[in-house]
Amino acid sequence: AGSGIEGADGLCASLAQAAGLGGAWVAWVSTSSVDAISRLAADGRWTLIDGATEVFPSRGDVQFGPLHAIDTAENGEVVSDLGDVFVWTNTDRFGKNVTAGQANACDDWSGQTGTADVGVVVDPQAAMGLSWTDTGQPRACGSEFRLYCFES
């Protein structure tokens, strides 16, 4: 799938294709030069893969957190251990790079050294609902975590 943000997008695209999902897909990750929010369509509305369960009514609503946990994989599998599943993002609740002005996440997603910020799959009604994209607890770049993929 390659490396960097293109590699993350490629992984999202290949997983979506394997699951029979159409469209183009991007990973919800930020780099030193690209904020995740800028990669989403301005007029978007995002749901879980069922097409009915609304997560974000619009791009502007991302800052308020998801209406429903982003708890469904591309194959329909529901993540049941909410609060224990980490997701690579390096992105704050406004969709901006968490480490702006600093050494960036895992060499802009091309390396395995250093750390990057993660989100966590959570119930949006929980006290930690906004940590879906930013826990404030960076993790080692060599770790294997999930990605949030948005249809673009």
Protein language model annotation of sequence segments:
Residues 1-152:
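Secreted/extracellular ectodomain signature
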